[in-house]
């Protein structure tokens, strides 16, 4: 490790100790002299004993800076790992940092564009529109078409700083994994690696631009979602240029009510958008917190969402999508045996899992939820509780499913904030049933046949030759297998005969040795020893020489 890494490591440990996070560890894991060591090496006392563990961790991450703040935000969505109290505290972390010098922003933008800002843009505003831990946003006007745009540029040295902190996080996670028995259940290394993949993806603004364009194309004809146009020719790994939008933050309910927005329709459209992204497009926005979502000012009676920040996107494979849809349908049909079967069939839990025990565990979690009205049941919490239950059966929650569960919780929270009476099931059920029918019904089978028709048409002329070759090969294999079986049987016969003779000779030799000690039976001892030697020789000669079949 470099000196800089050691210094940062010391700073991280000192901050964690300052907030007394060593208190949350089991006392048996820390040596008796640990408190003295803490005072001597780090000069800190725990002055936060009056605060709960979750609040202490939140304060520590705020002090450690942007990388740890975003890590805390990610942890707040892992309610399959953390208690509700800890997750709730971490969810209050805010990714807000002071803006960096606009001169540095100009320098970074011009380095990416390889051209002066004034040659491409008018009215570049040196005062940032927004500033976050990874990037900063400035406004300008495109010279080519007069369109108002925003320029999102990475902070100076952000990549090096993030990678250094990630390396340290992985080392700490590895240590925790070894130290704690609980560490195996929490899987700290897996959690940090998941976060690493997420945040490193956010460092590539060119990738974010491609994600935004793909999502925009998926909803070009939609009256429910609008994604701002991205100027891909001006986008680079450290710079993204996109259309500037004017909308109302989704969390500003007062402003939405003031313009007469149809909140019921808006809430229902949010649910439909989620299921459309997941099941129709298999490409969903996985960071749909209120700061990334705005509502159109036009047509408040027919409102649409405006989505920003496509740095984190998710997708599921076809099987996971089907299992997920069946899971939801089975839950609302109260078919807990089917839910347990689906978890095993999907590979989310081990095939040797006790289905009946798992079914009972699922029933204990799900059945109390039906005491609530349907419009109070949360899909996200259903999925979350199923993950928590399955974790007791050694489930490894896939990162994409965690992203989906987090997104579903966001969507539900927003929907019920907009319209508290939102009946999620009433909105989602027709969509899920229609999607399932499309996947397994006659139309789906015909579509799959139609899709694969060119391939099979190309292969059809080869079928007679393939059948003949396979029959010929099968005949050869059958003959060779019969020969191998014959050789194996002969080998076994020889081996049994040899073993029998060798065991018999051993018995004769032992008996001869015992009899030899008695002077009145020397003749019998000699006979046993001689016979034993002869039988041993016969057994040795008859043993099989070749084990190859």
UniProtKB/Swiss-Prot annotation:
In Gene Ontology terms, what is one molecular function of this protein?
ATP binding
List the transmembrane segments.
499-519, 520-540
Which residues does the UniProt record annotate as the domain Protein kinase?
A: 123-501
The record's family statement is:
Belongs to the ABC1 family. UbiB subfamily.
> Per its database record, what is this protein's job?
Is probably a protein kinase regulator of UbiI activity which is involved in aerobic coenzyme Q (ubiquinone) biosynthesis.
Q: What class of enzyme is it?
A: transferase
Name of the protein this chain belongs to: Probable protein kinase UbiB
Pfam families, alphabetized: ABC1
| Bilayer topology term | Multi-pass membrane protein
* Organism this protein belongs to: Shewanella amazonensis (strain ATCC BAA-1098 / SB2B)
List positions binding ATP: 129-137, 152
UniProt-annotated catalytic positions: 287 (proton acceptor)
What is any one GO biological process for this UniProt entry? regulation of ubiquinone biosynthetic process
Q: Which InterPro entries match?
A: ABC1_dom, Kinase-like_dom_sf, UbiB, UbiB_bact, UbiB_kinase
- Enzyme Commission number: 2.7.-.-
Q: Give the gene symbol.
A: ubiB
Q: Does the keyword Signal apply?
A: no
The record ties this protein, via SUPFAM superfamilies, to: Protein kinase-like (PK-like)
Pathway membership of this protein? Cofactor biosynthesis; ubiquinone biosynthesis [regulation]
């Amino acid at each position: 490790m470099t000196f800089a890494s050691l210094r940062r490591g010391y700073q991280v440990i000192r901050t964690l100790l300052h907030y007394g996070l060593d208190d949350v560890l089991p006392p048996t894991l820390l040596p008796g002299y640990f408190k003295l060591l803490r005072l001597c090496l780090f000069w800190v006392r725990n002055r936060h004993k009056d605060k709960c563990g979750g609040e202490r961790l939140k304060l520590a991450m705020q002090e450690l800076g942007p990388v740890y703040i975003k890590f805390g935000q990610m942890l707040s969505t892992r309610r399959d790992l953390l208690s509700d109290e800890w997750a709730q505290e971490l969810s209050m972390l805010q990714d807000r940092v002071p803006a960096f010098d606009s001169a540095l922003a100009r320098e970074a933008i011009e380095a990416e564009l390889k051209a002066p800002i004034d040659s491409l843009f008018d009215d570049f505003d040196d005062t940032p529109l927004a500033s976050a831990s990874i990037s900063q946003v400035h406004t300008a006007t495109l010279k080519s078409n007069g369109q108002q745009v925003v320029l999102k540029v990475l902070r100076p040295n952000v990549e090096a700083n993030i990678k250094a902190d990630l390396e340290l996080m992985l080392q700490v996670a590895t240590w925790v994994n070894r130290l704690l028995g609980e560490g195996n259940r929490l899987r700290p290394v897996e959690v940090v690696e998941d976060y690493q993949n997420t945040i490193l993806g956010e460092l590539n603004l060119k990738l974010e631009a491609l994600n935004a364009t793909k999502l925009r194309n998926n909803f070009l004809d939609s009256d429910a979602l609008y994604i701002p146009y991205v100027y891909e020719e001006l986008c680079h790994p450290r710079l993204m240029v996109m259309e500037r939008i004017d909308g109302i933050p989704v969390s500003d309910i007062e402003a939405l009510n003031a313009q007469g927005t149809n909140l019921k329709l808006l809430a229902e459209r949010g649910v439909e958008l989620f299921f459309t992204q997941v099941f129709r497009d298999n490409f969903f926005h996985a960071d749909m917190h209120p700061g990334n979502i705005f509502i159109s000012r036009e047509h408040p009676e027919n409102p649409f969402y405006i989505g920003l920040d496509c740095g984190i996107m998710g997708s599921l494979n076809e099987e996971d999508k089907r299992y997920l849809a069946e899971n939801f349908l089975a839950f609302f049909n109260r078919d807990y045996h089917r839910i347990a079967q689906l978890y095993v069939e999907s590979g989310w839990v081990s095939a040797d899992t006790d289905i009946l025990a798992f079914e009972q565990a699922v029933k204990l979690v799900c059945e109390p939820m039906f005491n609530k009205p349907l419009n109070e049941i949360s899909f996200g919490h259903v999925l979350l509780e199923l993950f928590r239950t399955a974790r007791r059966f050694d489930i490894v929650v896939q990162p994409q499913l965690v992203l989906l569960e987090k997104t579903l919780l966001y969507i539900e929270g927003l929907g019920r904030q907009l319209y508290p009476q939102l009946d999620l099931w009433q909105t989602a059920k027709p969509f899920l049933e229609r999607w399932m029918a499309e996947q397994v019904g006659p139309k789906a089978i015909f579509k799959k046949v139609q899709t694969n028709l060119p391939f099979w048409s190309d292969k059809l002329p080869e079928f007679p030759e393939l059948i003949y070759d396979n029959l010929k090969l099968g005949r050869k294999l059958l003959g060779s297998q019969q020969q191998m079986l014959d050789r194996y049987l002969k080998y076994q016969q020889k081996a049994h005969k040899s073993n029998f003779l060798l065991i018999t000779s051993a018995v004769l030799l032992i008996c001869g040795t015992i009899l030899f000690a008695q002077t009145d039976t020397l003749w019998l001892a000699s006979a046993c020893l001689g016979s034993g030697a002869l039988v041993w020789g016969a057994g040795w000669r008859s043993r099989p020489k070749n084990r190859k079949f």
